[in-house]
Amino acid sequence: MGQKINPNGFRLGVIRDWESKWYADKGYKETLKEDLQIRKFISEKLKDASVSTVEIERAANRINISIHTAKPGMVIGKGGSEVEALRKQLNALTGKQVHINIVEIKKPDLDAELVADSIARQLEARIAFRRAMRQATQRAMLAGAKGIKVQTSGRLNGADMARREWHTEGRVPLQTLRADIDYAWVNAFTTYGEIGVQVWINRGEILPTRKNKPASKPAKGGNR
């Protein structure tokens, strides 16, 4: 099961949380569609800002959006001008009050979405796919990853027949739920066609915290 299912969804409720946090008794379809529109708008608007994740949280007529990016300065702009303009555009798009929170990604080489996007852009720039995969795995391991697997599929180097190639370093235990596996799939659009880039990064294990139980009091009357 762990080899086939999306690793992010497989760990929801265990070591991962949902990227959309809201409840809709009515109008679920419209709310979900609005979430997709918000994410699409942000990804297109900030396509050069290394945005990895967009979290959406709703409360009454208010939307709280957390943008995880490796380039917070580009998103915020001088004096907060860029993020304020983005907030006004999202207000107009949704018709609701929008609050934006910028979260900086400290180690972009351990973020599967950013790594996959970097490889895809190199493929579009006609960089050799093996070189792009090897450099990505080396940077991830130097950044502290326990393991990484990169797979590219399509007409690699313009070959007549599509195929798959992968590069792996370290351990990537997909069936271990406590293993923090980050996964992403990005498409590269080249002159030879579309090439899929998949990245799995093992960032270590997340162990559940246990609360210490208070010591039991001895029974009255002493030991028997």
Swiss-Prot record:
Part of the 30S ribosomal subunit. Forms a tight complex with proteins S10 and S14. GO terms for molecular function: mRNA binding; rRNA binding; structural constituent of ribosome. It comes from the Bacteria. Residues 38-106 form the KH type-2 domain. GO terms for biological process: translation. This is Small ribosomal subunit protein uS3. InterPro entries: KH_dom, KH_dom-like_a/b, KH_dom_type_2, KH_sf_prok-type, Ribosomal_S3_C_sf, Ribosomal_uS3_bac-typ, Ribosomal_uS3_C, Ribosomal_uS3_CS. CDD domains: KH-II_30S_S3 (cd02412). Binds the lower part of the 30S subunit head. Binds mRNA in the 70S ribosome, positioning it for translation. GO terms for cellular component: cytosolic small ribosomal subunit. Keywords: Ribonucleoprotein, Ribosomal protein, RNA-binding, rRNA-binding. NCBIfam families: rpsC_bact.
